[in-house]
């Protein structure tokens, strides 16, 4: 069987299960969950992997799921397909969860549907029998940067070290055997179609600063006070002054959150 014939068999298997794959994405869209709290979503992914005869490992970096499909053509590289479990916080969105503000406005529901769809295609078409190495399907938690105060509390309690799910998976060794990883992402750019394969991905870290003021009578004794808001404004202005030094090709992004 040629490579193109094998790809065609996988495509046909995906088409046969298209309704099931779409249903996965829709189920996740209806029940958005925030990072490291994607219990329902990860349980759905686990169920789908088990239905394919895979043996997923769960609870990785709290809610991550990994299932390995071993090729029948001998040893080879380990290739990871990645999907992200979590939703954004957009409280004003019409589909936002009323209690958490979570909504899949970044399309991670479609990502996970694609991850499950790829697993369905490779397994149902018996493509792994003809491939060497392994294909690893990984559903990762907490790609988005919201809910930071909760995550920082988890760090202080020793349950997390990093604020993002991929960083935690790396720290815990769950990606040590992976030679190559890729993912798709929905895109707002018409020239990319409905989804794209990113050429690169930014790393991310978070910093927290606390500005402490001192209360004073605004009319009678303003000189006795310290305005914490002014201090925060100065800090943001200093950060903004750095932006012109960022090189476009480095795709540096700075997103302050003031609470």
Show which residues each predicted segment covers.
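Acidic/His- and Gly-rich active-site-bordering loop/insert found
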Residues: 3-105, 109-136, 141-142
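N-proximal short alpha-helices
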Residues: 1, 14-18, 22, 198-208
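Intrinsic structural disorder
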Residues: 1, 6, 27-28, 179, ...
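Histidine/acidic-residue-rich, glycine-tolerant segments that coordinate divalent metal ions
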Residues: 90-103, 109-110, 122, 129-257
């Amino acid at each position: 069987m040629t490579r193109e014939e094998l790809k065609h068999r996988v495509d046909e298997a995906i088409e046969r299960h298209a309704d099931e794959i779409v249903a996965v994405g829709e189920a996740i869209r209806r029940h958005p969950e925030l990072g490291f709290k994607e219990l329902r979503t990860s349980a759905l992914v686990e169920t789908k992997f088990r239905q394919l005869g895979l043996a997923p490992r769960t609870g990785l970096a709290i809610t991550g799921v990994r299932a390995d499909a071993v090729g029948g053509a001998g040893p080879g590289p380990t290739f990871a397909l990645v999907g992200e479990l979590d939703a954004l916080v957009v409280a004003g969105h019409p589909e936002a969860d009323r209690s958490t503000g979570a909504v899949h406005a970044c399309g991670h529901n479609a990502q996970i549907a694609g991850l499950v769809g790829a697993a369905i295609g490779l397994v149902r078409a018996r493509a792994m029998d003809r491939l060497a190495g392994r294909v690893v399907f990984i559903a990762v938690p907490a790609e988005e940067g919201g809910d930071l105060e909760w995550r920082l509390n988890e760090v202080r309690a020793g349950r997390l070290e990093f604020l993002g799910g991929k960083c935690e998976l790396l720290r815990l060794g769950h990606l040590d055997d992976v030679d190559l990883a890729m993912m798709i992402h929905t895109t707002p750019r018409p020239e990319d179609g409905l989804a794209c394969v990113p050429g690169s991905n930014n790393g991310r870290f978070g910093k927290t600063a606390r500005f402490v003021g001192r209360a004073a009578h605004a009319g009678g004794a303003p000189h006795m006070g310290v305005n914490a808001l002014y201090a925060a404004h100065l800090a943001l202005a200093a950060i903004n002054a750095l932006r012109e030094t960022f090189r476009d090709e480095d795709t540096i992004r700075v997103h302050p959150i003031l609470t």
